[in-house]
Each structure stands twice: as structure tokens, then as C-alpha cells.
């Protein structure tokens, strides 16, 4: 097999439509746009969501909720996920990024207590749930709020 000799399978590629090239082409004269009207004109057509003057659907539906611009979002890590580390490891947000337990550190890392922690670790994070603190200390580890 030579890469320069490869050809597409017959029927896999379509030839380009040549518009406005005489009646024999099948797309001559009006070029598939029909006769007159808004959609036949240059730049013609209606904007997305336009319903002919009737109140559009997106305006008929009531507005809901709001975006809280002061919201602080933390990357979440559960205690069961910390079992991948060896005993005595100092777990930091940087280490969690390296081991891909978090994809990105948003406003920081928060540790939650889902699952059982079986390793003795020193965990450094921005926030801890009360049950996560208890779980880490019950396993013999220590916590440190950054």
C-alpha cells in the first residue's frame, strides 16, 4: 500500500453543487432559492427564534433563577479517594492535581467524608466537612486548613 496512491471509495465523496450555471445544471436561474421573497434575497432569512411576529417561545416562558456572581466553588475530594496514598503521605492540593484526583483547583479543595479512610495521612486543604475531619483523625491522620 502506497499512501500517495490511495483514493476514496466510490460514492464516498460528492461533487460540489455549481449554482446558477444554466438550466441544464438543474440549479440554474434561481439557484435553488425559488421565486422572490425574503429567503431568496441576499442576506435574507429570519433570525433564530423568530416566529413571524408572534411572541416567540423563549419570551412566553417565565424567567427563573439568577446567577450568583459571588459564589465560591471548591474542587471536591472524598475520603475514600485518599486511600490511593501511602501511610504518612502529606496530601496537598498540588499532589491531588498530579494524581488527577481533581481536574483543577477552583477556589481551593474541600474534603468530604464519603467512604472509609484506611490510611494515616496529613491532609492539607482549604475546607473540610465535620465528618471528614472526624474520619481523618479516626484513621490516625491530621488535618491542616490552608
From Swiss-Prot:
Binds to the 23S rRNA. Residues 21-31, 42-52 have a biased composition (Gly residues). Residues 1-53 are annotated as: Disordered. Coiled coil: none annotated. Pfam families: Ribosomal_L27A (PF00828). Belongs to the universal ribosomal protein uL15 family. The keyword Protein transport does not apply. Transmembrane segments: none annotated. Keywords: Ribonucleoprotein, Ribosomal protein, RNA-binding, rRNA-binding. The keyword RNA-binding applies. GO terms for cellular component: cytosolic large ribosomal subunit. This is Large ribosomal subunit protein uL15. It comes from Acholeplasma laidlawii (strain PG-8A). One of its GO terms (molecular function) is rRNA binding.
